[in-house]
Regions:
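Well-ordered alpha-helical scaffold segments within catalytic/enzyme domains
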Residues: 39-41, 111-120, 167-173, 220-223, ...
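Short, charged, amphipathic alpha-helices and their helix-cap/turn boundaries
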Residues: 72-91, 130-145, 180-191, 244
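Membrane-interface helix caps and helix-loop-helix hairpins in membrane proteins
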Residues: 148-153, 200-201
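Active-site nucleophile and cofactor-binding loops and adjacent substrate-binding regions
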Residues: 99-105, 130-135, 151-163, 206-212, ...
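Terminal-appendage/accessory-domain detector
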Residues: 1-100, 205-215, 222-463
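Hydrophobic alpha-helical hairpins/lids featuring a short glycine-rich hinge
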Residues: 86-145
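Structural helix-adjacent loops and short alpha-helical linkers that scaffold large soluble proteins
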Residues: 118-132, 175-182, 229-233
């Protein structure tokens, strides 16, 4: 069986009862994480969110779904687009490192918008178990396509694989038959957004590609359910996703994972910092050296990071004057300088004063990223770091796994620290009672009667 047929069969037949306790727990955790990250995107540190919000309203009126935090009513397509931008706009959303896919950024906004729309338009509320199942379907489709790639990315895989997965997830949310689900995925393929050019330039359009992918998934479902006929061999056909967009691919590992019924949410990593994931290990190592050795920024002569080629491709870009926050989030030299001055990189690390700080620029110019011999085009580990001090010391540290990954998972306390850090940066204040209510609901997501009740907790009504 090809991966195409295996994935579609999996998406059409997976049931809540098939999921392990570990998969259900991981779903709760990453729904919590992704919602919190999206809520933080409403804050002033992501000003372009207002542009996306205005565009969503200009593209059409509707009341079937809502914007997170601020609560404006929108068509499901508009809500998916806006909330998708909020989730990915600060590089703080979770990532499936083997696939190099940020699955939840596209998937969760699309599924939540579709769930609200189904309840509002058809009086058919979507419960927590259905949402959990649909999220797992979507993440499995997105990431199993991603792990099949064998060449460096040319197209923005998080948006593309995310759209394909989200379309399958929405179809599962509606309990669609196998034929309709297939049409939804195929129609999503017809709308795939995103190249790596936005990443190379550090453009905020990178997150917009995720937003458009989330919108495309909802659009695909609405066409599919009405019977619109798409091309069907869109994953492995002559001009299907894998041969056209990825070029080199091997579906063997994905087929093996499906045969073993391995939930891909168990392979998803938290983002510990609001930066590119390829920069996480470097920040983590420098934080250790800073604390262990009592280092100050003035003590450092140079920093050398030994890393796989993907790290160099994604985050070894130079510091430059007047860089945008979207560029700085992917600029490892700037991020390491911020670690030395602030202790860690948080959501407030990208203000104009910090971006123009000459001390950061000075250290950034003395950071090098060099190959470590890895030939895996998708690997982010292992990595090692050598810091040379002005008094001649050579300090070294290494990581076999990235912080937040399944091999080095965040503790519950660290997860809650991130949750609260995100809500602290939302556009409207979330008091302790609202935060606890939201956490209680998320911790019992499988007991949720209606996804709209969860969205209610994401919104602060104006006083």
């Amino acid at each position: 069986m090809r991966l195409t047929e295996a994935l579609l069969a999996h998406a059409a037949t997976l049931r809540y009862e098939d999921l392990s306790a570990q998969a259900i727990d991981a779903t709760r955790v990453f729904v919590m994480d992704s919602l919190a990250v999206g809520m933080s995107g409403t804050g002033p540190q992501l000003p372009l969110a207002q542009v996306v919000r205005d565009a969503a309203f200009a593209l059409g009126e509707g009341t079937s779904a809502r914007a997170w935090v601020t609560g404006e009513r929108l068509p499901a397509t508009g809500a998916a687009m806006l909330n998708g931008y909020l989730v990915h706009g600060q590089e703080f959303d979770c990532v499936h490192m083997p696939a190099v896919v940020h699955p939840m950024a596209v998937i969760l906004p699309a599924l939540v918008a579709a769930a609200e729309a189904r309840a509002n338009q058809e009086q058919a509320p979507v419960d927590g178990r259905t949402l959990i199942t649909a999220v797992n379907v979507a993440v499995d489709v997105a990431t199993l396509l991603g792990i099949s790639a064998r060449a460096p990315m040319r197209f923005f895989r998080p948006a593309m694989c995310g759209a394909l997965g989200a379309a399958a997830g929405i179809a599962r949310l509606y309990d669609a038959d196998a034929s309709t689900l297939h049409r939804a995925v195929s129609l999503a393929y017809c709308q795939l957004p995103g190249t790596m050019q936005a990443h190379v330039e550090g453009s905020p359009a990178l997150a917009m590609q995720v937003a458009m992918a989330s919108r495309a998934a909802v659009t695909s479902w609405e066409l599919a359910r009405r019977g619109f006929p798409p091309p069907m061999d869109v994953l492995e056909g002559r001009f299907g996703y894998l041969p056209l967009y990825e070029g080199e691919y091997d579906t063997g590992p994905a087929l093996a994972a499906l045969a073993a019924r391995e939930p891909q949410l168990l392979q998803v990593s938290h983002k510990m910092f609001p930066t590119g994931g390829a920069a996480h290990a470097g920040q983590d190592m420098l934080m250790e050296l800073r604390d262990r050795e009592g280092l100050r920024i003035a003590d450092i002569e140079s920093i050398e990071l030994q890393a796989p080629p993907l790290v160099h491709r994604l985050v070894a870009r130079p510091w430059k004057e007047d860089m945008a926050p979207s560029y700085a989030r992917l600029c490892l030299p700037y991020l390491l300088a911020t670690v030395m001055l602030d202790g860690r990189v948080g959501l407030d690390a990208y203000g104009a004063e910090r971006l123009s700080d000459p001390r950061r620029a000075d250290l950034a110019g003395r950071v090098r990223v060099v190959p470590n011999g890895s030939e895996d085009p998708n690997a982010l580990a292992p990595q090692s770091m050598t810091v040379t001090t002005r008094d001649g010391r050579i300090l070294q540290v290494a990581r076999d796994a990235v912080i937040g990954s399944p091999a080095r998972p965040l503790t519950r306390g660290q997860q809650l620290d991130k949750f609260n850090h995100c809500l602290d940066h939302a556009a409207l204040p979330f008091d302790a009672q609202r935060r606890q209510s939201l956490l209680t609901t998320l911790d019992r997501l499988e007991a949720l009667a209606d996804v709209r009740d969860l969205v209610d907790l994401l919104i602060i009504e104006p006083t």
